[in-house]
From Swiss-Prot:
Residues annotated as domain CSD: 69-136
Annotated segments matching region Disordered: 1-22, 36-62
PROSITE patterns named in the record: CSD_1 (PS00352), CSD_2 (PS51857)
Gene name for this UniProt entry: Csdc2
Keywords: Cytoplasm, mRNA processing, Nucleus, Phosphoprotein, RNA-binding
GO molecular function: mRNA 3'-UTR binding; RNA binding
Protein name per the record: Cold shock domain-containing protein C2
Function of the protein: RNA-binding factor which binds specifically to the very 3'-UTR ends of both histone H1 and H3.3 mRNAs, encompassing the polyadenylation signal. Might play a central role in the negative regulation of histone variant synthesis in the developing brain.
Location of the protein in the cell: Nucleus; Cytoplasm
Location, primary (coarse class): nucleus
Amino acid sequence: MTSESTSPPVVPPLHSPKSPVWPTFPFHRESSRIWERGGGVSPRDLPSPLPTKRTRTYSATARASAGPVFKGVCKQFSRSQGHGFITPENGSEDIFVHVSDIEGEYVPVEGDEVTYKMCPIPPKNQKFQAVEVVLTQLAPHTPHETWSGQVVGS
């Protein structure tokens, strides 16, 4: 009778890389075409971190959903960066909009009429962002792209 050891095989421990691995993007936010066009939008106008539908609290979502519906016009929107701004119908300060808050099948372009509700941007809750954004009238004579990439119109 032999006494053989039935210990598990030795597995080397996992090691993480010596330097962190960061995703690379084909552009930098500050040097993207959105900033080169002008229009008064600067990196300091963007909330940081960008608030999304996914990171918003349930209570903030419920308050926004219960709030009034506003009208405005899309000032600009960058699909690649996932955000843009809406100019309110009443002429007040432009409102930030995140891609996760746009409903419907079309990517907004400058001049599209929209309806939206408003939600405060944490942590100070001094500025607002547009949520539940619906395109009500597409800008005439402007090609529009669907989220799947199909271009519609001329």
